Design a protein with these regions (language model features):
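Short, structured beta-strand/loop micro-motifs enriched in basic residues and often containing a Trp
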Residues: 1-8
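Acidic, aromatic-enriched beta-alpha/helix-loop junctions
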Residues: 26-62
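Short, compact, well-ordered microdomains
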Residues: 60-95
Length: 95
């Protein structure tokens, strides 16, 4: 399974808090194990989910300096442009 965990929030996010997770098993989001889903977060995540789920090294995708974790951020720029904030997601294979 691919685990997408909120690692950091820069500003304010009305949906996520640090430690929240989205869990993906194959082609499905496992709703019972997922804390929240925000439309702003789906756009950047969906570009990489299949590759990461299938074991592509995040370094080759330019998403990390480490081989077993990727970092992707939400598209909300936060202050002073919006009242929200940027969420940094840590993506890794887990159970």
């Amino acid at each position: 399974m691919l685990i997408i965990e909120v690692s950091e929030i820069r500003g304010k996010c009305p949906v996520y808090k640090k430690g929240d997770k989205i869990v993906i098993d194959g082609p499905e989001i496992v709703l019972e194990k997922t804390d929240a889903i925000r439309i702003h977060a789906l756009a950047p995540l969906l570009h990489y989910v299949v590759a990461l789920r299938d074991g592509v090294d995040p370094r080759k995708l330019g998403l990390s300096k480490e081989e077993d974790v990727a970092y992707i951020q939400c598209v909300d720029p936060g202050e002073p442009y919006t009242e929200g904030g940027t969420v940094i997601f840590k993506c890794y294979i887990g159970e």
